[in-house]
Curated annotation (Swiss-Prot):
This is Leucine--tRNA ligase. A motif ('HIGH' region) lies at residues 40-51. A motif ('KMSKS' region) lies at residues 576-580. It comes from Clostridium perfringens (strain SM101 / Type A). It comes from the Bacteria. The lineage of its organism: Bacteria, Bacillati, Bacillota, Clostridia, Eubacteriales. It is found in: Cytoplasm. GO terms for biological process: leucyl-tRNA aminoacylation. Belongs to the class-I aminoacyl-tRNA synthetase family. It catalyses: tRNA(Leu) + L-leucine + ATP = L-leucyl-tRNA(Leu) + AMP + diphosphate. Its EC number is 6.1.1.4. One of its GO terms (molecular function) is ATP binding. PANTHER family: LEUCINE--TRNA LIGASE, MITOCHONDRIAL (PTHR43740:SF2), LEUCYL-TRNA SYNTHETASE (PTHR43740). Its main location: cytoplasm. Keywords: Aminoacyl-tRNA synthetase, ATP-binding, Cytoplasm, Ligase, Nucleotide-binding, Protein biosynthesis.
Amino acid sequence: MGNYSTAIDKKWQDKWAESGLYKFDPNKEVEKLYVLEMFSYPSGSQLHAGHWFNYGPVDSWARFKRMQGYNVFQPMGFDAFGLPAENFAIKTGIHPQDSTIKNIAKMEEQLKAMGAMFNWENEVVTCSPEYYKWTQWLFLKLYEKGLAYRKKAPVNWCPSCQTVLANEQVVDGACERCSTEVTKKDLTQWFFKITDYADELLDKLDGLDWPEKTVSMQKHWIGRSTGSQVNFKVKDSDLNFDVFTTRVDTLCGVSYVVLAPENPLVDEIVSAEQKEAVENYKEEAKKQSDIERQSISREKTGVFTGAYAIHPLTGKEVPIWVGDYVLATYGTGAVMAVPAHDERDFAFAEKFNLPINRVIEAKDGSETNLPFCEHGILVNSGEFDGLTTDEAKEKIVEKLASMGLGEKKVNFRLRDWLVSRQRYWGAPIPVVYCEECGIVPVPESQLPVELPYDVEFAPDGKSPLAKSEAFVNTTCPHCGKPAKRETDTLDTFVCSSWYYLRYPDNKNTEAPFNPELINKMLPVDKYVGGPEHACMHLLYARFITKALRDMGYLNFDEPFTSLTHQGLILGPDGLKMSKSKGNTISPDDYIKEYGADVFRMYLMFGFAYTEGGAWSDDGIKSVNRFVERIERIIDTAREAISKGENNKTTMDKAEKELNYWRHNTIKSVTDDTDKLQFNTAIARMMEFINALSKYTQEKEMNLDFLKDVVSDYLRLLAPFAPHFSEEQWNLLGNSYSIFNEAWPKFDPKALVKDEVEIAIQVNGKIKNKIMVSSDLDEEGIKAAALADEKIIASTEGKTVVKVIVIKGRLVNIVVK
């Protein structure tokens, strides 16, 4: 048993806090490094192994960077508003504010027990009025610039959470929080106009040091398509509608058009005979998720409206249908159907016996089955016959433009960000409604609009704040007459879309941040968190940064220069941890038994950081044995240094061998840690401790050299085992603190050995290994190999045909 324990942890945590070791000085004249882990929801009662896997290893990386000379800023806070905290409160019967504050206190205690060098003086908590005052300020600034607006729209509704969900919060047709099937509802909601930044959000992705998969996910989510917009007029009316298509070359093959069930045009054009059928169909469509509606394998459904459109080129009548495979949220909510050249249109046309007109043939004239979806040559297209797909796209758009019936168009899959929620635990939207003045933003001087405590927050589908007359009834800031407050609250993703900007200036009461300071401190240099945020938080933060830049508050384009996703720690059974499965890991229990450093080192050694894996009790036990072994070997070295006996001052063979391992380890650990490859870095340190152990068994040792080696080893180990290393550093008689020491630098000359080991093969089989001078030439190596006693014995009575020398590695002697 070693001496390392939680008592050592506590000793050094107190010392670090008392001495202000990690206090950040923004005026320090060295390169800053803003290291940020995604802050956690305080919705449960404590930190789990997943939190630790995010925070512990990244803290080690930040410590490593500090020792390399960077001015590291590593703040911590809590994403305290939103559904998780509110649902926890509903489940336990405790008010969200009370449970959240209690949970934060517990999680702060756990995070401090980790021994991370978080800058707690810069903490932010999103549910505090001091923070959400500025979230409301952000809303007002977006509203002022036309980037926040209110409209009635079909929205995603979770019947279980009793609230609206953004598109990004719907996964496979279900609520990402509770997995309940999502339905559609028409509600008046607040949106942020993220689509105004769609091009830049897409184009700037390739300049980021982000995981390729995350970049691809955002590109797909933004979904830029270059095509054409075509206008169709409705027969016998003044009505018309646009369709977006990437295949305008197939326009002459249109045999019907389809509107989304939610398209408002449907109610205007439906005939009396078809009205009941269309209404019934619209009701059924509300029960289907967007994922289900767009499934290729699902049988197509639809209903005829009784109305017809006029084809813009041919003048022919084409029937207007309603089909749920068309989404109101994509393009214009209407599609031109070309069944000969589109699989979904083909399936729909076959089912409802609609015309199928071929207008594209293969370039080589070969027979092709329908639907033929490739590019080719136009046929049955009048003046456009014989043109290639690309030529026809240009000519047809030119013709449509001359008629005022079409134009080139870029379309995006990205929709505006829906930010209002019918829940209690969120930042109130700073708007009032006045009969005289309409929508009136709350003046900045009246912020924050505080969330009242005494509110019935159990979900019933309405905004809980609407039940509080004291909150709702107010006076109009513009005319002074009675007015009503907005009772929806902001999506918690609004709170987290700008928190990284608040950390460096968290005590500012006059503004959300000082632009001069923030432009010096940001962007964040290293951001670490889960990949599940790819199309939500990470996209929203990019949008808010760009919007604030355009308002003149920021001088940078992107919030997070480099992004890493940590892997997932699974239960011992290899399954995702959950209380219901009974496979959760409590860090507190393991820390109590082994200490925070052993727990941290196991997470860093037992798993590749970006992959994660299944928890193993055997794994943490082996890391504990490793730490105990380090302690024993350093104790032995320290005792020898203290006694000063059998000392020598020369660098002989044993010293050179240890020096080689020392510098080899410095190089490897530096390279691996820089790339967050912590498991291989620790493996190198395990190898080095073997070499150190071997040296301490020498009869005579160079004790000054030994102290230097042990000091270097502790500096390498310090980011991975901060409390243990600080203690050992102190016991070695060094000055406080090891984290004020410089990171060791490797000496390339030390990696060139005086002697190297050469394997000797006879006819491909290894017979012996010998040590030779590293600068020995080929002839010298050959002579040394042939003179070796074991090789003489192995080749006796045989003729040496050939000797092959691979310098520095092996000699192969061919005999017969």
